């Protein structure tokens, strides 16, 4: 049996085989160079594999033996004599039935995708054209390489060799891994610039860190860890409050420089260190910088990609490892390119654009891929609108989203950070797995109907949907510009809302902006004044609020079946509370217009 054998055996079936065991995994340079400088560790690695036939997540936690303080033992005998597989000999497999092991031998190893360019206008729909080419290499090579990446030997360039460019994401990861060249699918040890965690995942991350590195271990860099309580804050729930206590104790113990604490829950304004929603606070406090790698224990960490950096969410196990080493094993994602051109209509916002995109490619369309946003429309967006674009790439399955940094980016960062940063941009010869083009001038306001962000519909097509409430807030739709947009609709209508309208600023700064910044064209009125005249609820304490449900006493939580138009990012059953609640995701324009009528409403009725 050779590695060149073809078979139709499904990779998905193979991935459903029992857990794989590993012996002798390679370590990050900082650990492997001098094992005597570190105590023995027990690592847990997350293995991700994507099926070529369809988006498919293969995730196993594999515990390795304690790392020896002496040189690693010699590699075991290779599984077979295939020359293509010998380089992975440090790995052995067990607990794999012989039948599956034999079947796996037939599995194609690599897949190259070719996505046709798409021209997209109003109301267009399509299924991305993807064709798969199956390689002849041994299937085990692919999986083994994911588990134990090796540095391939590179021969000197020969006459006539072609230098291929890299995408933004590839360049950032190359720089952070001290590599001159990277390609999608490679597994690399990345040096992390910023690690963020919050009150929901922080306690778990801290627990794993202490278990694996020792109760008295110190974090790798106290100035590169940001801890932000924001999710379950203004509640009497004891478990939620205990989580905040845990991250506070850890921050004090480790002398974490950037811990944005809140102690008095009765009045957030007396807590000068408290910020609010982590993703918006990271930007406002200068932790988002072009060309860097930012990881967070929250899926919407991709929000920071608006600054031209690699930002993605990770689990507690990975975060615990990063806390102790400052490194993480990452697989380089391929990049999808989204070109948005045309003048932005006055009735559209970035939320309409990202809902349009997700509706086109589906919630699985960008699975473990980078989404790069370019074009004249993107260049015209302010930083908060760019953050909205990148925030929801994870709703399409994306690994990360990026916007090329420009003068708008640099101006936003002035006064927010004193650290130097190095912007990077995609090469002209960079390879993209697919490209989608949108003529933004032809698009209309859209919503995502229950119960999925890709269940897209034109807002005007949902005019008969009666609603019970409107919610304006979250990391996606609770920024200053989002409230300015809502106030613009209320001001233009001169009417009062017909359903309860809840306002939850993302951060303290946003809250203060609502009471201090005049709304353009209002004659000096602030958002808070316009909201009061329209009959909205008083702006609440800044936090994640009801975006993710939370304890029963969370402000604006849906504790009974209701229909809600929301500027948040997810609408699966139970997301904002009651499992029978229905959530229509929309832009602040559409949310405000709907509040005025009591039905899902196209904002062009008022703008």
Which ranges hold each PLM region?
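Low-complexity proline/serine/threonine-rich segments in eukaryotic and viral proteins
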Residues: 8-99
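Fe-S-dependent hydro-lyases/dehydratases of central metabolism
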Residues: 2-4, 63, 84-607
